Amino acid sequence: MNKLSQLKGHRILFIGIGFYDYDQSIIAELKKLNKEVSYFSTHTNIWNLLIFKRLHLNKISEKILKKNIDRQINRSSINNDIVFVIKGENFDDSHLIKLRSLNPNAIFILYLWDDLHRLKNLNTLNYFDKIWSFD
């Protein structure tokens, strides 16, 4: 969190993955730093996705996920100072282009829990100003 506290700007759009209570803990810490935080998760409706994946209907699963992320982006706050994304594995170019257009002056930060070699969407890294990792 120390790196985020050093960044200028108080409005943060935090895009998490809804993993246990990590996202809520991160939001609480950001608020302690006097940041105004808006949030959404890229992993809502996970049960529907799991069912389709188990049935080997990956195209349907991907379409549902993409629509869900589109809907979340359209509902998200705009003109943020920082867009802070954890993992970002479900984003495609269109999602990040839309986020950039809604937050034209924001610093885009990607935080990775995994090594870059494990990313399936390496092409989206170019949309981020900073990439941080646990390493």
Model-derived segments and spans:
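Extended catalytic core of nucleotide-activated donor transferases of GT-like folds
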Residues: 13-15, 22-27, 32-33, 38-135
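Nucleotide-activated donor-dependent transferases that construct or modify glycoconjugates
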Residues: 3-18
